[in-house]
């Protein structure tokens, strides 16, 4: 079999994932406003795809053409553009369908031509007092450099200023970072109707207010557009520059980086399209997409709660882990010292982790805190706790990953703020991004120093802990805490030899251990012993690991995969992957945790990890996976995995055709895994 048929291109697999998001917008069993929000998620995902994956592909094509080689990437580019165009057409149809459905529910998203006299007057007042101060037209002339001026992924109105036979052009930025994108209008009769208007259409209505008195014109016409830039940057090393200075300089490159996508309103005049293409230096490799009247649908992620309660998801209140609430424990450390604690977000509240770090910041027994941050919330209580700890005389070390994509600027800010507070801030070594989710608290207890560790699958982020599924293991088990200490030493001295007996740490031992564990399952299958591999991942694209899974399947090992995003492996290929089943689940929460399960001859090994099975995570990042040593907690993870694989509502097959076919229910009972997991965890968290 040809090698190209053994793997799905990761870019196409990623687009198939985003099409699963679009399926959620189309799913009539989802509440109406949630469906509208899924359109926003789809749009936001696609923006990131163009910034990162499409931009990388464009660079590969240019390099191959400069070298005179025949590029497979150019063929892939055509496939991508065809697939995106088809999905975008479906998106437009869905949006119009949802607008009609909203109208049936008395929610009206109207445009500037549908305003009543009363609403027109109200909007002019709104524009004058809340919006006008944020509007400054960019006039387009021979000297205008739009690549320098325009912001990445912002919506602009391109305005024709027509005077006789002369047409001039200007751009207006839609200031959705300063004013809400959705504006509630005064209701008309019948008063149960809830009219709203998009910020874009307020500007269209108020064009006269913007240009009158400055330009003579017979007519003004406005058309929407946006541009997406390449998100890559180069770290240009200078002898006297710190990593923070290099990152700050490199981020400025991103602000003026090459465009990779130009989206414009379908009825924009051809002459205006040509002017914008020329000014934005759009090349034949870039994506040029004629679209609808509105862009930046990512704002629809925050579509407001209007109308009846049944138009949004029924709330699932966060659950407390009742172990922390037992009266015998004076604080969180007492609870963790007695036994390991496993939290599973967003079903459990993230408050337990925030509270433990708050306690550590002032507890007289705490000597030191070490933590690594990758993406934190905008108003991070964790950062506040680290600053308070430093003020209280604790030895605080915060590892800040300055190269966390799209969070670089925020992390530079946090690093400066922490340093000013007296926190010891360290950064990753060049080319070795830190993606592990760790903290280590050292506490004086009698004559001993007892260490408490956190190993997680997700970021220390209060916001994403409400939306992403992730595990936190909290432990005082010295077998684990001693090795977490070694990980922090490795982070500070990445070129010193270090060994681990329990933890799986990239780039030190992850590939070797994963190969060994897969090979052991192969040997067990060949000897007739219990064998099997179950993986829950965001992405599975490392060819070495995919090939190892193919080998396991060929030896009779049953492999079950739950992959949310990219999956290069093709299940159910005859003679290659007959024993591999792969599904994906997209639902109200983003499936983010990584779990590795190996049958191990009947003595199952269960790992929780920060690492996906991508080459970068295995070989070029610091990642940590921990075994679950407590049998109770191991069973809990196994139970949750069983529920996920029993899903008959939101599970889709991953297949060669990228069909996103739903797993048929057959005669099985209806199981929506995320709701079932909530009920399962709720049943565990009952008072004694």
From Swiss-Prot:
Catalytic residues as annotated in Swiss-Prot or TrEMBL: 435 (phosphohistidine intermediate)
GO MF term (any one): ATP binding
Highest rank taxon of the organism: Bacteria
PROSITE patterns per record: PLD
A Pfam cross-reference name: PP_kinase_N
Cysteine disulfide links: none
Keywords annotated in UniProt: ATP-binding, Kinase, Magnesium, Metal-binding, Nucleotide-binding, Phosphoprotein, Transferase
Any single Gene Ontology cellular-component annotation: membrane
Cofactor dependence: Mg(2+)
InterPro entries listed in its UniProt record: PLipase_D/transphosphatidylase, PP_kinase, PP_kinase_C_1, PP_kinase_middle, PP_kinase_middle_dom_sf, PPK_C_dom2, PPK_N_dom, PPK_N_dom_sf
Catalytic activity: [phosphate](n) + ATP = [phosphate](n+1) + ADP
Residues annotated as binding Mg(2+): 375, 405
Modifications made to the protein after synthesis: An intermediate of this reaction is the autophosphorylated ppk in which a phosphate is covalently linked to a histidine residue through a N-P bond.
GO biological process: polyphosphate biosynthetic process
Ranges for domain PLD phosphodiesterase: 430-464
Record: residues binding ATP: 45, 468, 564, 592
CDD domains associated with the record: PLDc_EcPPK1_C2_like
EC number per UniProt: 2.7.4.1
Biological function: Catalyzes the reversible transfer of the terminal phosphate of ATP to form a long-chain polyphosphate (polyP).
Record family assignment: Belongs to the polyphosphate kinase 1 (PPK1) family.
Protein name: Polyphosphate kinase
Organism of this sequence: Salmonella typhimurium (strain LT2 / SGSC1412 / ATCC 700720)
């Amino acid at each position: 079999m040809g090698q190209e048929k053994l793997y799905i291109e990761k870019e196409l697999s990623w687009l198939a994932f985003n099409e699963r998001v679009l399926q959620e917008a189309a799913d009539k069993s989802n509440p109406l406003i949630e469906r509208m929000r899924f359109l926003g998620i789809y749009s936001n995902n696609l923006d990131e795809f163009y910034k990162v994956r499409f931009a990388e592909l464009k660079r590969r094509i240019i390099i191959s053409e400069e070298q005179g080689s025949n590029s497979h990437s150019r063929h892939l580019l055509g496939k991508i553009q065809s697939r995106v165009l088809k999905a975008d057409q479906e998106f437009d149809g869905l949006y119009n369908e949802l607008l009609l459905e909203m109208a049936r529910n008395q929610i009206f998203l109207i445009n500037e031509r549908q305003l009543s006299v009363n609403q027109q007057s109200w909007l002019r007042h709104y524009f004058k007092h809340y919006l006008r101060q944020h509007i400054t037209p960019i006039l387009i002339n021979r000297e205008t450099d739009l690549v320098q001026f325009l912001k990445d992924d912002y919506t602009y109105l391109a305005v024709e200023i027509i005077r006789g036979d002369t047409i001039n052009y200007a751009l207006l930025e839609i200031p959705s970072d300063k004013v809400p994108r959705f504006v509630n209008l005064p209701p008309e009769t019948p008063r149960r109707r809830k009219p709203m208007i998009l910020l874009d259409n307020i500007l269209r209505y108020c064009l006269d207010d913007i240009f009158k008195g400055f330009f003579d014109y017979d007519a003004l016409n406005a058309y929407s557009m946006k541009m997406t830039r390449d998100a890559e940057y180069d770290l240009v090393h200078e002898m006297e520059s710190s990593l923070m200075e290099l990152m700050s300089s490199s981020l400025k490159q991103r602000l003026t980086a090459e465009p990779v996508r130009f989206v414009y309103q379908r009825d924009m005049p051809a002459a205006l399209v040509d002017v914008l293409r020329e000014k934005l230096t759009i090349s034949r490799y870039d994506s040029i997409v004629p679209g609808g009247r509105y862009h930046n649908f990512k704002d629809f992620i925050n579509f407001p709660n209007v109308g009846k309660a049944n138009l949004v998801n029924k709330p699932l209140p966060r659950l407390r882990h009742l172990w922390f609430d037992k009266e015998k424990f004076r604080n969180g450390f007492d609870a963790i010292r007695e036994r390991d604690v496993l939290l599973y977000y967003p079903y459990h509240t993230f408050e337990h982790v925030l509270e433990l770090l708050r306690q550590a910041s002032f507890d007289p027994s705490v000597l030191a805190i070490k933590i690594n941050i990758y993406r934190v919330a905008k108003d991070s209580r964790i950062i506040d706790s680290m600053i308070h700890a430093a003020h209280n005389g604790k030895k605080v070390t915060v590892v800040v990953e300055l190269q966390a994509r799209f969070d670089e600027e925020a992390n530079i800010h946090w690093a400066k703020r922490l340093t000013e507070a007296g926190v010891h801030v360290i950064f990753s070594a060049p080319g070795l991004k830190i993606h592990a989710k760790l903290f280590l608290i050292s506490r004086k207890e009698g004559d001993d120093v007892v260490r408490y560790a956190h190993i997680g699958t997700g970021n220390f982020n209060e916001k994403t802990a409400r939306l992403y599924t992730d595990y936190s293991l909290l432990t005082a088990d010295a077998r684990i805490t001693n090795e977490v200490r070694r990980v922090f030493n490795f982070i500070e001295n990445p070129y010193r030899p270090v060994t681990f007996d329990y933890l799986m740490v990239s780039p030190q031992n992850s590939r070797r251990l994963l190969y060994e564990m897969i090979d052991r399952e192969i040997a067990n299958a060949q000897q007739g012993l219990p064998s099997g591999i179950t993986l829950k991942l965001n992405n599975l694209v490392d060819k070495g690991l995919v090939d190892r899974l193919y080998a396991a399947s060929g030896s009779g090992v049953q492999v079950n995969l739950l992959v949310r995003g990219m999956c290069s492996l093709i299940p159910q290929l005859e003679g290659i992957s007959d024993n591999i089943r792969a599904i994906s689940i997209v639902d109200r929460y983003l499936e983010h945790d990584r779990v590795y399960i190996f049958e191990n001859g009947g003595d199952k090994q269960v790992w929780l990890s920060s690492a996906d099975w991508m080459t970068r995570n295995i070989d070029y990042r610091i990642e940590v996976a921990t075994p679950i040593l407590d049998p109770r907690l191991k069973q809990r993870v196994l139970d949750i995995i069983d529920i996920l694989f029993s899903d008959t509502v939101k599970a889709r097959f991953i297949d060669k055709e990228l069909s996103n076919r739903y797993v048929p229910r057959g005669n099985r009972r209806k199981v929506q895994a995320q709701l079932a997991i909530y009920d399962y965890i709720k049943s565990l968290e009952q008072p004694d």
